[in-house]
């Protein structure tokens, strides 16, 4: 069976006609005339498509379109037959599924088959009724049927616009317009798929896009609403994402600002630290200059004061000869005395003078000979007193900042009274300021590292004049010796003391490792036992209600509330752990059990003790 599209067209009966004539007209239109090319084949599947008689598409008034005039070949209201749109002229409008579609009209010379196959005059006018067509998406083609009754709504008006389909007899007609709905199937299908086409037609009628009248508009509005809602949801989601990104950007900016502020603070602190270090260096450098000036001034003053004394001693020494060897040594001390006086700082000479004068008769190793005179002994004492101040100066090297409190009043006569008072105190005291760490962390090591080379310079400067002093000056100077190190010889196999291979090493240390592991296990067991014992004690104390005494945390440093007495002195006590250190007189250290009598007693006791042996 060839695939083609059959167009059925029927005209409405006259208004005054009988219903029997109308039925005959419909039957004749259904069966076809002599000019019907489809013949009985198309009338054969007419009963199957009785559904096409259902109400057609709405009128132009219902769809809003203008009524389309009938073609020129449709004159007279008597009968309408098969329409072949081969020679139709476009330009007329008709109402379809989606709106008005141009309906091709045949030329005036064509013959239209009506009832009885009467020809229609070419000049006859078209009836004012609109012509409608419907396209069925069946496999044999698109069948277009024009309604022949009053303009009643048709169930087929549920989809989009359908163009007029060309028949198989006139392939030269205009091409059909594309359907917005489901496209028609290929024309190669067989006639056995008519039932499937009917089911698809039902589905099109039931679909929301194929609904006619107000239902189609409402479904389209609902679809548009859903699309709008989806778009709104998408916009909201994108706005939320943008807000989240903006928040992240703001947080990152704030973190960046805080980090920049921290970096600026650190830079400022570093600059302040550098400035402080530079100030300290300037202070130290400035401190050296006034010290040197004061030392030079003091040395000049002392030289002027001591010049007459030195002249007297120099005159007294050659006038009286020495009869003993030791007096000769004292005579030779005249030359180093002059050298030491010129080069050594004489800041501490005056306070030490009184100490040496009081101590020299007791502890001076030089004994007066019977042949020596009084002037000789005085000269020796003066020389010894001037040489002795170098001992504390060289042995106790202090930085110049700590020795500054003794600059001014060194030559003042009050120093003698201070020295006597210091000797009378029962505890150690000093006039130099020293650092006392009282519940404070130790200072940073940076300034100590910076001041260390300066201390070495002062030590070297103090040692130079003492090295010139000669035999009389006793200095605690470390002895530097050069040790010549010989190169190592090639080791002989006999000289190697032990084998250091991995296997030998592991064997040697395996036993020690095992012992260490055992000790560790034993420690863990003891710790567990102690914890168990503590738990049991806690249970017992809880049952008895005994409160366990907590150990008090004590410290060597006394509390300020425990002050016993106040003492205001110009001297600083040497304090250790909050207590002043007692002043001990210099004497030989002796132990009671090292005495001869105690030794004898211990030996006697050992001899008399019987030897006991355990007998079994």
From Swiss-Prot:
Belongs to the msl-1 family. The coiled coil is formed by helices from two subunits in the MSL1 homodimer. Sumoylated with SUMO1. Keywords: Acetylation, Chromatin regulator, Coiled coil, Isopeptide bond, Nucleus, Phosphoprotein, Ubl conjugation. Residues 378-394 have a biased composition (Basic and acidic residues). Signal peptide: none annotated. The modification Phosphoserine is found at residues 66, 127, 207, 364, 385, 395, 444, 452, 484. Non-catalytic component of the MSL histone acetyltransferase complex, a multiprotein complex that mediates the majority of histone H4 acetylation at 'Lys-16' (H4K16ac), an epigenetic mark that prevents chromatin compaction. The MSL complex is required for chromosome stability and genome integrity by maintaining homeostatic levels of H4K16ac. The MSL complex is also involved in gene dosage by promoting up-regulation of genes expressed by the X chromosome. X up-regulation is required to compensate for autosomal biallelic expression. One of its GO terms (biological process) is positive regulation of DNA-templated transcription. Component of a multisubunit histone acetyltransferase complex (MSL) at least composed of the KAT8/MOF/MYST1, MSL1/hampin, MSL2 and MSL3. Interacts (via PEHE domain) with KAT8 (via HAT domain) and MSL3 (via MRG domain); both interactions are direct. Directly interacts with MSL2 via its coiled coil domain. Directly interacts with NUPR1. Interacts with TP53BP1; this interaction may be required for MSL1 DNA repair activity, but not for histone acetyltransferase activity. Forms a MSL heterotetrameric core with MSL2. Isoform 1 and isoform 3 interact with TTC4. Residues 215-284 form a coiled coil. Residues 172-186 have a biased composition (Pro residues). This is Male-specific lethal 1 homolog. Isoform 3 and isoform 5 are testis-specific. Isoform 1 and isoform 4 are ubiquitously expressed. Isoform 2 is expressed at low levels in the testis and brain. SMART domains: PEHE (SM01300). Its main location: nucleus. It is found in: Nucleus. Residues 81-91, 153-171, 187-196 have a biased composition (Low complexity). A motif (Nuclear localization signal) lies at residues 319-348. Residues 225-239 are annotated as: Interaction with MSL2. The modification N6-acetyllysine is found at residue 355. There is a cross-link at residues 303, 367, 380 (Glycyl lysine isopeptide (Lys-Gly) (interchain with G-Cter in SUMO2)). It comes from Mus musculus (Mouse). It holds the Pfam family MSL1_dimer. Residues 474-593 form the PEHE domain. Residues 395-409 have a biased composition (Polar residues).
């Amino acid at each position: 069976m060839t695939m083609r599209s059959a167009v059925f067209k029927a005209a409405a009966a006259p208004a005054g006609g009988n219903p029997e004539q109308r039925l005959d007209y419909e039957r004749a239109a259904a069966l076809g005339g002599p000019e019907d090319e489809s013949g009985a084949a198309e009338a054969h599947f007419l009963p199957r498509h009785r559904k096409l008689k259902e109400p057609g598409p709405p009128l132009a008034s219902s769809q809003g379109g203008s009524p389309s005039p009938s073609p020129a070949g449709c004159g007279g209201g008597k009968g309408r037959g098969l329409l072949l749109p081969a020679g139709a002229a476009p330009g007329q409008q008709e109402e379809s599924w989606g709106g008005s579609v141009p309906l091709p009209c045949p030329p005036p010379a064509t013959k239209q088959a009506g009832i009885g196959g009467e020809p229609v005059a070419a000049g006859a006018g078209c009836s004012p009724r609109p012509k409608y067509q419907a396209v069925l998406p069946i496999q044999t083609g698109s069948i277009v049927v024009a309604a022949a009754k009053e303009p009643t709504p048709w169930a087929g008006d549920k989809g989009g616009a359908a163009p007029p389909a060309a028949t198989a007899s006139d392939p030269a007609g205009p091409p059909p317009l594309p359907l917005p709905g489901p496209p028609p199937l290929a024309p190669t299908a067989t006639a056995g798929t008519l039932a499937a086409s009917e089911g698809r037609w039902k589905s099109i009628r039931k679909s929301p896009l194929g609904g006619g009248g107000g239902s189609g508009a409402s479904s389209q509005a609902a679809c548009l609403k859903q699309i709008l809602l989806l778009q709104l949801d998408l916009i909201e989601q994108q706005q939320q994402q943008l807000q989240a990104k903006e928040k992240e950007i703001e947080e990152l900016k704030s973190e960046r600002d805080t980090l920049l502020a921290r970096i600026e603070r650190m830079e400022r602190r570093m600059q302040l630290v550098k400035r402080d270090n530079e100030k300290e260096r300037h202070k130290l450098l400035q401190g050296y200059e006034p010290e040197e000036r004061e030392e030079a001034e003091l040395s000049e003053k002392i030289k002027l004061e001591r010049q007459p004394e030195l002249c007297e001693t120099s005159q007294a020494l050659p006038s009286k000869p020495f009869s003993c060897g030791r007096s000769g040594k004292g005579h030779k001390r005249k030359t180093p005395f002059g050298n030491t006086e010129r080069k050594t700082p004489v800041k501490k000479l005056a306070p030490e003078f009184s100490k040496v004068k009081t101590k020299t008769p007791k502890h001076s190793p030089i004994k007066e000979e019977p042949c020596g005179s009084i002037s000789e002994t005085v000269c020796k004492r003066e020389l010894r007193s001037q040489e002795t101040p170098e001992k504390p100066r060289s042995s106790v090297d202090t930085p110049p900042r700590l020795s500054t409190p003794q600059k001014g009043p060194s030559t003042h006569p009050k120093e003698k009274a201070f020295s006597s008072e210091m000797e009378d105190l029962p505890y150690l005291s000093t006039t130099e300021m020293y650092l006392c760490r009282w519940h404070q962390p130790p200072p940073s090591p940076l300034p100590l590292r910076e001041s260390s080379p300066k201390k070495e310079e002062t030590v070297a400067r103090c040692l130079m004049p003492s090295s010139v002093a000669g035999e009389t000056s006793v200095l605690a100077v470390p002895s530097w010796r050069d040790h010549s190190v010989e190169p190592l010889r090639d080791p002989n196999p006999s000289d190697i003391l032990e084998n250091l291979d991995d296997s030998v090493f592991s064997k040697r240390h395996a036993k020690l490792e095992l012992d260490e592991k055992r000790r560790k296990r034993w420690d863990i067991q003891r710790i567990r036992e102690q914890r168990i014992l503590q738990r049991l004690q806690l249970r017992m104390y809880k049952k008895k209600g005994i409160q366990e005494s907590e150990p008090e945390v004590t410290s060597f440093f006394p509390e300020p509330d425990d002050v016993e007495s106040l003492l205001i002195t110009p001297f600083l006590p040497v304090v250790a752990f909050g207590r002043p250190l007692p002043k001990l007189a210099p004497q030989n250290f002796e132990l009671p059990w090292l005495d001869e009598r105690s030794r004898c007693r211990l030996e006697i006791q050992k001899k008399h003790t019987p030897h006991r042996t355990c007998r079994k």
